[in-house]
Amino acid sequence: MNKQQNIGFIGLGVMGEPMCRNLSTKSGLKLTAFDRREEPLTRLAQVGVGRAASLAEMAASDVVFLSLPDGEAVRDVCLGNTGLIAVLNAGAIVVDLGTSPVALARELDSRFREHDVLFSDAPVARTRAAAEAGTLSIMVGAESRVFNALEPLLRMMGEEITHCGGVGSGQLVKIMNNMVLFQTVSALAEALAIGRGAGIDPAVMFSALSKGSADSFALRNHGMKAMLLDTFPHDAFSTTYAMKDLGYALELARDVGLEASGAQLVQERFRQAIDAGFHDSYFPVVTRVI
């Protein structure tokens, strides 16, 4: 890792702020952040993170990390009239830490290369608590030399760093990860409803499931920490965001000629949860519509 690197970070939301904090405190590098909200910038200033008033102030960055809500936001920040493509120097690397369409990742790679700027998709998985602890799983799509340059920085935010292949492959794997997670949470919601209806203590049931072949990350986290407690905060991965990611998965399924009926069922349940007013709630709230 080059100790003279300048790092930019755009997007300080639920995951972005703790990732930015870890990157700053662990790397010792000069780090400048951009967000439309004042509060996270003020908090991060306490650990030495500078603030950019506009994207133009990212011009001196050697690496720029993005943690944005969706592909449209990523496209705007990268390719807009005052976007990164207009300000970054040759040799800079742009890294998308969020979940965006595979096709967009490959388009951005092509567009940035016209300006001798490199691009990598490196979407993160796990929870906000993992972002705070620096124990995220990060799935990287990049050519080998770009991955090698980024890996030391990524290890300051995550503990499991997987080079999935070329640009776009990180997004593809992350989208499949989320599709499987959403279907698992939906299955847990069904089990919870059936168990309650049949008169069993849900806590006893989930504890027993965790000791058998039904054990999973989703059971131990989304199931035990949210669904059992019937607690679905607004400062977590919302139903709206889950619906967005599931849409990316179904788009990929259509591209390869697969119906993906399980994912379609979960999409309908997310739609029901959103219609019931749970759009901003932590997505395991889907249990309330089953």
Predicted segments with their positions:
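NAD(P)+-binding Rossmann beta1-loop-alpha1 motif at the extreme N-terminus of oxidoreductases
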Residues: M1-L66
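Rossmann-fold dinucleotide-binding core
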Residues: I7, T99-N178
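Hydrophobic beta-strand scaffold residues
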Residues: L31, R51, L118-S120, I161, ...
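Rossmann-fold NAD(P) dinucleotide-binding segment
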Residues: L55-S67, G71-L118
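Helical "substrate-binding/catalytic lid" subdomain
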Residues: S169-I290
